[in-house]
Amino acid sequence: MIVDLSHVLQTGIQIYPGDPEVEIKEALNVEKDFVNVLTVNMGSQSGTHVVSPFHVFADGKKLSEVELSHFVGTGVVIDATGLSDRQEIPTDRFVSTDVNGASIALVRTDWSQYFGSDKYLAHPFPNIESLEYLKSKGITTIALDFLSLDRTPGAGEDFTLANHYFWSQGDGIIGENFTNLKAISVARPHISMLPLNLGASDGAPVRAIASW
């Protein structure tokens, strides 16, 4: 069984506020040019993507410097469903989950159902204590079915990257904008989230899948 965990990359897809817009258009077509080719303009963190430590640390590892083992491995789904707008995910959602034997934690909130809407910006988010727990259990990569590892600020709220700073220490990898985590029906799926091999990159889109 193979389950696609990726949003379709297309013109106008929702991005983090302030990031470059995604534009995909025809460059060549078979009727005039014998072949179909697209022009793709987008930021490095568009759609379903991974984030390297270089995103938040000037001396952090760039994506092409990260071991490929961080992008494939045994996954475990953490159930963080049923939460409210901008709610901090309770720590017990993490510590009550058996993550032994996994290297990739997938945090399921089902917030991906709001992708493309303003409500998607009001996603839940973890706290440092929960991230510390995952690291203590050997999790190297965390993947989310929402916009950002940190709270995306609403009007009048302060901007923070505290969770990014913490997780990105020690080569931690973040996956954002995953979808369809509810379709994973086994305890330990194999996860693949290999990024484009962009040199000197802070991140890149992925075609993420779960299989078993």
Residue ranges and their predicted role:
Residues 1-212:
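Active-/binding-site microenvironments in catalytic and ligand-binding cores
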